[in-house]
């Protein structure tokens, strides 16, 4: 069984997120999502989530592509989750990341002998665009 892991805040879940989950699921049998409580605490340039962790968790658990959800607060949690998953699934683990992460050398995933698949972003769906549309329609 191939297990995939992808993480993010998934605030205001939109079509772009769903397309990414669908792409991830095409490459694995079981998809685990890491749900970040507040990405602003790890990267100050990130926006604080609009939705609560409960709202985001509840919405994600209803997605047919997602099999399991881990909640995390910081980079150390992601490292611990990755270590746990690698210990459990070994080379059957795939780490999914947005293609925007290509070329970065500070990723914990690079320290583990696992596959990394960069998901494509061949669309214009984003949280920022959704917020702009909501602001303009109100």
Regions found by a protein language model. Give the residues of each.
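Nucleotidyltransferase catalytic core that binds NTPs
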Residues: 1-138
């Amino acid at each position: 069984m191939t297990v995939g892991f992808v993480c993010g805040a998934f605030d205001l879940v939109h079509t772009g997120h769903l397309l990414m989950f669908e792409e991830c699921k095409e490459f694995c049998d079981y998809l685990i999502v890491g749900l970040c409580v507040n990405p602003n605490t790890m990267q100050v340039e990130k926006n604080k989530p609009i939705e609560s962790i409960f709202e985001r968790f509840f919405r994600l658990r209803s997605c047919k592509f997602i099999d399991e959800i881990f909640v995390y607060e910081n980079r150390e949690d992601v490292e611990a989750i990755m270590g746990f998953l690698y210990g459990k699934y070994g080379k059957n683990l795939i780490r999914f990341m947005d293609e925007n992460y290509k070329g970065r050398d500070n990723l914990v995933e690079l320290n583990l002998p696992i596959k990394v698949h960069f998901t494509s972003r061949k669309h214009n769906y984003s949280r920022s665009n959704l917020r702009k549309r909501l602001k303009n329609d109100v």
